[in-house]
């Protein structure tokens, strides 16, 4: 980055070209690119991203850990299979919704699993009823 306080970049845009450009640009450098868009995790790892910041891992960490291990082992077929699983998990709360609607649903899923309470901070509102 060139700035001592910026040590990595997390890209959560749903833009394959953007994460590909970032991951390839910084591959092999000491400036990690982290993928934040779950639908692009598998691709981002192929392109050189060095980590994931997955919302779905808050309630289902296992497929993300398996994906990371598969990617570091070069098992891209397993990565593709895991990407499908992760995308289905992601649909439970995101499914094209804006962040202001998907975050309360994520919290509700986590609350159902006993991981946290369902409350969110303003200006967001707690999820109610079917999504």
Residue ranges and their predicted role:
Residues 1-90, 94:
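Catalytic alpha/beta core domains of metabolic enzymes, predominantly
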Residues 120-130:
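Short, flexible active-site recognition loops that position polar ligands and cofactors
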Residues 41, 45-49, 88-122:
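Conserved short secondary-structure transition element at the edge of the structured enzyme core
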Residues 60, 79, 83, 99-103, ...:
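Generic structural signal for well-ordered, non-membrane alpha-helical segments
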